[in-house]
């Protein structure tokens, strides 16, 4: 139901969680799935209870789907059985708190979401298939996560692509929407349409495409610097399979594909933001273990990640590894890395050498390099030369010599 009807939770059952990582974990045969959600704030408190709601229980709150608590891993967890491996299911976590109020959130590690406010336009214009799972209108509110325990696997035609010379890339920055869209017709600014023009891009002497942010962002019409779900690619441009087909086709033509990633901040739609949220101030709450209430630097928008938090570091590194392995991206352009710091600064001091920021970026680069030694990591940094030189010596590349010509 869309409203928060009266629900009396059962006493919380304390039990060891059978999985080691937060997220969605299908069984080997695909007939069951274990969900695990991290919940522990900076005051060492957690919500009063958590329930699963979704297509598997017709979105009804019930003690049958009340999640168990593992206080060692700080997880809420539950195993749902009777799953059809060939079917997509929508679901949310319903988090109950007498102190903070109740909230419905998706899973931060899900690979697809449904948006009741925006998906209908994608269906109407043929960008997202009408035959695919749709938003459960009238049964819940907010963004819905999707899982399938046995999805069809993509058959990569090129599985071993490598950048010939990472120091000699001619990069074409591409926004799917603007590259081919005609007027307001969403169906003309898609992955499918862009794929048709790869010959043109190659004719320019380009050997790498840098996709502007495509991880799930608020709305349908955006440059993508307002991310909310990092493991889900935005449906505004096409399906997961179409994203992979685009990358595969680029690799066939000798073109690397880099992804512009936005880890400085996220919108209030992100599950980590919603879990500990100050509704009076429209900001992340002081006890949120992932976000700062206010950015310590002067360049932030939306809600600023605390990159000193082990939780944030783990999340970012897990996401980088996922993108390299699942989509075979050849590297990344990191947006606004100057903001990866907890040291307070102003416009005059933000570019000064920051040793803690260097440590953070080296940590992320290690994950990239370990996962794919050929992958590149380009920083939009614009800090003092002593800091940029140290990052460059570590193997990272930096925007430099910028001009307006």
Show which residues each predicted segment covers.
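Short, solvent-exposed loop/turn segments at the edges of extracellular beta-sandwich modules
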Residues: 1-6, 98
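Generic enzyme active-site microenvironment
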Residues: 171, 258, 333, 378-379
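Non-catalytic, glycine-rich low-complexity segments
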Residues: 7-45, 134-136
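Aromatic-rich carbohydrate-binding modules that target alpha-glucans
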Residues: 13, 35-88, 96-119
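Substrate-binding/active-site clefts of carbohydrate-active enzymes
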Residues: 110, 114, 153, 157-166, ...
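Core domains of carbohydrate- and sulfate-ester-processing enzymes
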Residues: 91, 95, 100-158, 272-294
